Every structure is written in structure tokens, then in C-alpha cells.
Regions:
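Aromatic-rich carbohydrate-recognition surfaces in CAZymes
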Residues: 1-98, 118
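Catalytic cores of carbohydrate-active enzymes
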Residues: 92, 98-155
Length: 155
């Protein structure tokens, strides 16, 4: 996994009823990561933000041309898109659950965070190639990776 692991781990725990942590503090961190691009590699290494977030928000997926500098694999745009979409879904569910719990957190419906995250949660669809039915690399122009392009493999 190459995305934002804290959101899926903390969100899953909270939804399942594990509450031995400060969910408000956790939510602050999860929201910061979901909406912030790290300015430097050092910030990313220290767990701040999502890499390639600007492309993810601009296109609704991370295009193949957007290789992530200093990543273990520079060709992980599809995996990163899928994980970010999953993380956005999990965070939206946490916000919705907080809305109906005794735990305090600002109303996500009023701030638009829930709706924004649910829109982003559907971005996984943008890397599903309708002609193959598989998640596949996609270029910034909207075209999908072809067999001829497979000499340079993307995940």
C-alpha cells in the first residue's frame, strides 16, 4: 500500500467501536492528510499529507505522467488513486459516524467535508477501463494504457 494508511487503520478502528484514542485529534490528522500536499519529501516521510494530491484532485485520478519523486516505485499511479479513493471513503464514514455519536466534531454536512470526500471516494471509477473492466493506468489526456505501452509497466 502506498497511500495514506493512518486513515484506513484509525477509521476502521473507530467504525468498529474501538474508542481508546482521541478521535477528535485523530480526525484533525486524517483531515490534514486528506487535504494537504507535503511541500517536501521530508514532510512526507514525517507523515504529512498525500503525494500527487494535486493531480488526484485535478483529474480525479493520478495520471501516468505524474511519477512521484523519491517513491520506492515511481509507477504506482493506479494503486495510489485506488488507495486515496478508499481512504476518502473511510474518512467520510468516520465523519458521518461522529455526526451521530456523543463524540464532538463539527457537522460535516455543513462544512461540506462529507460530500467532498464521498465525491472523491468515487474517483476509483476513473481508473477502471470500460473496455477491459480492469483498473488500468490512465494518461492526463484521459486515454488508458494500451498493450503497446506495456513495455513500461505501471501498477
Amino acid at each position: 500500500m502506498i497511500g495514506d494508511h493512518c486513515i484506513s487503520a484509525l477509521g476502521d478502528a473507530y467504525i468498529k467501536g474501538i474508542r481508546n484514542f482521541d478521535i477528535n485529534k485523530a480526525c484533525e490528522g486524517m483531515l490534514r492528510n486528506a487535504f494537504r500536499t507535503p511541500a517536501t519529501y521530508e514532510e512526507y516521510k514525517n507523515g504529512m499529507g498525500r503525494r500527487a494530491l494535486n493531480s488526484y484532485l485535478k483529474y480525479g485520478y493520478i495520471p501516468l505522467e505524474d511519477s512521484v519523486p523519491e517513491a520506492f516505485h515511481t509507477c504506482e499511479q493506479v494503486s495510489r488513486t485506488l488507495e486515496y479513493a478508499y481512504d476518502d471513503f473511510v474518512l467520510a464514514q468516520v465523519l458521518q459516524k461522529l455526526e451521530t455519536s456523543d463524540d464532538y466534531f463539527p457537522d460535516p454536512q455543513k462544512t461540506g467535508l462529507y460530500d467532498t470526500l464521498m465525491i472523491r471516494a468515487r474517483y476509483y471509477r476513473n481508473v477502471i477501463n470500460p473496455s477491459t473492466g480492469y483498473a488500468q493506468g490512465r494518461y492526463a489526456d484521459g486515454s488508458f494504457l494500451t498493450d503497446a505501452d506495456n513495455a513500461f509497466s505501471f501498477t
